[in-house]
Curated annotation (Swiss-Prot):
NCBIfam families attached to this UniProt entry: PRK11646.1
Keywords on record: Cell inner membrane, Cell membrane, Membrane, Transmembrane, Transmembrane helix, Transport
GO molecular function: transmembrane transporter activity
The keyword Cell inner membrane belongs to this UniProt entry's keyword annotation: yes
Protein name (Swiss-Prot/TrEMBL): Multidrug resistance protein MdtH
Compartment(s): Cell inner membrane
Pfam families in the cross-refs: MFS_1 (PF07690)
């Protein structure tokens, strides 16, 4: 691929990511507020619905990636985004737990189609030395989109949840049209790869599979920004607007620190050390919420948590792209989402159930201590994994 095509591809992917993240954050953080806080549903039910969405999207991501290896990126991306739009639109009319679960699963099916090929396009449009920086820039752009989306969603939630869902659906329809009309029919692999062959190549890479599974603990922490963090902040502040403050804080940290930290980290630290440092900060931030009694204290710990994500996520994504084999990029990037599937499902369901149990028992600190323990366990497993598998660290050379 010529450099001009790579450069145009990077610009398109950046703008496309902004539309996708706007559509996602308009809707997703509002689901727990709508059904738990406003409607009085059990957090466990809402967590189950969100977890099944995560499990569907990321658990089937390896299938979406394999299909993209065979048929190319564009048809999977366009079809997946339209399916996501349908799922978000149906959320507006969910009146029971079953309807909420079905809407979330439809949304997840859309994601399992468009997410792996988009991740594989990052590999196609970047050279290895510039990939980490480009991923960091994408994360900065996505953070800005997240805060705008969350602020829009929290504002529209004051009027009607239907407006929230229809705006999110509309943004995904726009993204689908842009991909249909602008994105060339790129192939992701060096040659069309049979689905079974791509899957087999990934499953034979034991070190990669082990790392992906360990990272499910990282994601169990990460998804709490969609579930119990918004509930806690809203309850302590007394207004849904405070949820927007959460994402404003995240954006401020991302825009000011993400790129400089990523550049500094590239020069001075290995990818695995950056990843583990980020998990340590996330664990500290989420575990100490158990002892926070004021909203400012919660926001200080949120800042620590977000800083951990800012350090860990570029390193994690860069590590995944470097470990992906050229003959099965879509399959590798799809399988890399399995950790998010398992961790997201566990985090959503476990977080929601712990929230309900803690409220019933008068022990509001319990979910945060349990999540802190998950973080410590994940960190220890990562240390052991990188020690046992030097090949995972060798990609830094």
């Amino acid at each position: 691929m010529v450099e001009r095509a790579r450069r145009l591809g990077r610009w398109f992917l950046a703008l496309d990511s902004l539309l996708v993240i706007l559509g996602f954050f308009v809707v997703m953080p509002m689901i727990s507020l709508r059904f738990v806080d406003q409607q009085g549903w059990a957090a466990g039910i809402v967590g189950l619905a969100l977890g099944l969405r995560q499990l569907t999207q990321q658990g089937l991501g390896v299938l979406g990636g394999s299909l993209a290896d065979k048929f190319g990126a564009r048809p999977l991306i366009v079809g997946g985004m339209l399916l996501r739009a349908a799922g978000f639109a149906s959320l507006a009319y969910a009146q029971s737990g079953l309807e909420l679960i079905l809407s979330c699963i439809i949304s997840g099916l859309g994601g399992c189609l468009f997410d792996p090929p988009r991740a594989a396009l990052v590999i196609k449009f970047t050279r290895p030395r510039q990939r980490g920086r480009y991923i960091s820039l994408l994360m900065m752009l996505e953070s800005a989109g997240a805060v705008v989306g969350a602020l829009l969603g929290s504002w529209l939630l004051n009027f009607d949840f239907e407006y929230v869902c229809l705006l999110g659906a509309g943004l995904f329809v726009c993204a689908a049209l842009c991909n249909l009309l602008i994105l060339p029919p790129y192939k992701l692999s060096q040659r069309p790869t049979p689905i079974r062959a791509g899957l087999g190549q990934v499953l034979a890479d034991k070190a990669f599979c082990r790392l992906v599974l360990i990272l499910s603990g990282y994601y169990a922490l990460w998804v709490q920004v969609m579930l119990i963090f918004p509930i806690l902040v809203k309850q302590m502040a007394g207004t849904t607007t405070a949820v927007g403050w959460m994402y404003t804080l995240e954006t401020a940290i991302s825009l000011t620190l993400l790129y400089p930290l990523a550049r500094y980290g590239e020069k001075h630290f290995k990818l695995e050390n950056r990843l583990m440092a980020g998990v340590l900060l996330m664990t500290t931030g989420i575990g100490l919420v158990a002892f926070a009694t004021t909203l400012p204290a919660v926001f200080v710990l949120l800042a620590c948590f977000y800083l951990g994500i800012v350090i860990a996520e570029p390193a994690r994504e860069t590590l995944m792209t470097k470990l992906a084999q050229p003959g099965a990029r879509g399959s590798y990037m799809g399988f890399s989402r399995l950790g998010l599937a398992l961790g997201g499902m566990t985090g959503y369901v476990g977080g929601g159930a712990l929230h309900d149990y803690a409220n019933a028992q008068g022990q509001p600190w319990l979910p945060w201590l349990v999540l802190g323990t998950v973080g410590v366990t994940t960190l220890l497993l990562l240390v052991n994994c990188f020690h046992r598998e030097p090949s995972l660290a060798r990609v830094n050379i």
